[in-house]
Amino acid sequence: MVSALYAVLSALLLMKFSFDVVRLRMQYRVAYGDGGFSELQSAIRIHGNAVEYIPIAIVLMLFMEMNGAETWMVHICGIVLLAGRLMHYYGFHHRLFRWRRSGMSATWCALLLMVLANLWYMPWELVFSLR
């Protein structure tokens, strides 16, 4: 399953973001909240934003693949999703709004493509079956 590749890569990305938060919490000795440190605030939001988008994207990608979408379509969506998350990280981390905006746009494009692919490949005869 191709979607497993993107689930694994996304999980690694989430782990990296999580480690960044933990490292900064230890550095600034902050157990709860952000302690008013902007670097920690950014790391928390980078991680939080990824947690908000990646899980639903992976579920959509898995359903898309299970519904019979072409393998190349799954790869395109996975690449756009990961590129978007990396651009968002880079833009947020370096305070470059253009990169952050581009990353969110790529993430939304990937989500929209997966929604449309799922609607297209949905086994509608089973969805509306009374059996």
UniProtKB/Swiss-Prot annotation:
Transmembrane segments: 108-128
Encoding gene (name): yecN
Cell location: Cell inner membrane
Chain ranges on the Cytoplasmic side, renumbered to this chain: 1-107
Membrane topology: Single-pass membrane protein
Keyword annotations from UniProtKB, A to Z: Cell inner membrane, Cell membrane, Membrane, Transmembrane, Transmembrane helix
Tagged with keyword Transmembrane: yes
Disulfide bonds: none
Organism expressing this protein natively: Escherichia coli (strain K12)
Descriptive protein name: Inner membrane protein YecN
Pfam families: MAPEG
UniProt-listed InterPro entries: MAPEG-like_dom_sf, Membr-assoc_MAPEG
One cellular component (GO) term of this entry: plasma membrane
Segments in the Periplasmic topological domain: 129-131
